């Protein structure tokens, strides 16, 4: 596993520690972001850093496949690199529509992918309309929902305290 992006930022909880705690083997890590700036300019510089660093790492690792999940710039970079290096690219959650820049990144990633795991039939049909071969598209559901389903119940009092919630007031959960 290569760790980068927001996993290495303090403002997002330096979640590389969670990855380590969960027992995943980390081959290497690198910082994509050149500043704490969330501007479009910083996003493009970060993407450039991902291309440069991941191409070096993937060349050295020589993986059998490149897994490019979701709609994140680093995953788009890995899909571009994998395709250029003739390594099969697997993309998760292609064909989704959000109406944001993420949608464009997701669709572009899908075009570099060879195998697609979609969350639903509509997303699969969208990929087929984009020219992807239906025999390489598999509807597998949403792994995030599976993860939520398998979460152990947390006492309400703990949730209220940890996240500073008041369940006497209306609460909306967005996933």
Segments predicted by a language model, with ranges:
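Conserved nucleotide-sugar phosphate-binding/catalytic loop shared by glycosyltransferases and other
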Residues: 2-46, 53
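Short hydrophobic segments within beta-strands
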Residues: 2-4, 92, 175
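A nucleotide-sugar donor-handling region in carbohydrate enzymes
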Residues: 7-13, 113-175
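Short, electropositive, low-hydrophobicity segments enriched in small/polar residues
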Residues: 17, 99, 145
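Short, well-ordered coil/turn elements that cap or connect secondary structure elements
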Residues: 21-25, 84, 132-134, 167
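Solvent-exposed, flexible loop/coil residues
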Residues: 23, 28, 34, 76, ...
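Conserved beta-strand scaffold positions in the cores of enzyme catalytic domains, especially
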Residues: 26-29, 89, 136-139
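Active-site and donor-binding regions of nucleotide-sugar-utilizing enzymes
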Residues: 32-133
């Amino acid at each position: 596993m290569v760790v980068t992006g927001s996993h290495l930022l303090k403002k997002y909880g330096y979640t590389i520690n969670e990855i380590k705690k969960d027992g995943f083997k980390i081959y290497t890590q690198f910082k994509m972001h050149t500043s704490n700036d969330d501007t479009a300019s910083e996003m493009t510089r970060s993407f450039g850093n991902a291309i440069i660093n991941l191409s070096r790492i993937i060349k050295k690792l020589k993986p059998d496949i490149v897994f490019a999940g979701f709609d994140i710039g680093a995953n788009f970079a890995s899909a571009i690199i994998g395709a250029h290096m003739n390594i099969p690219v697997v993309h998760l959650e292609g064909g989704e529509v959000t109406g944001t820049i993420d949608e464009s990144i997701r669709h572009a990633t899908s075009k570099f992918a060879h195998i697609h795991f979609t969350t639903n039939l509509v997303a699969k049909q969208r990929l087929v309309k984009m020219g992807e071969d239906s025999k390489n598209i598999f509807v597998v559901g949403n792994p995030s929902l599976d993860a939520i389903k398998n979460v152990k119940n947390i006492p309400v009092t703990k949730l209220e305290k940890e996240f500073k919630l008041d369940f006497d007031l209306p609460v909306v959960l967005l996933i």
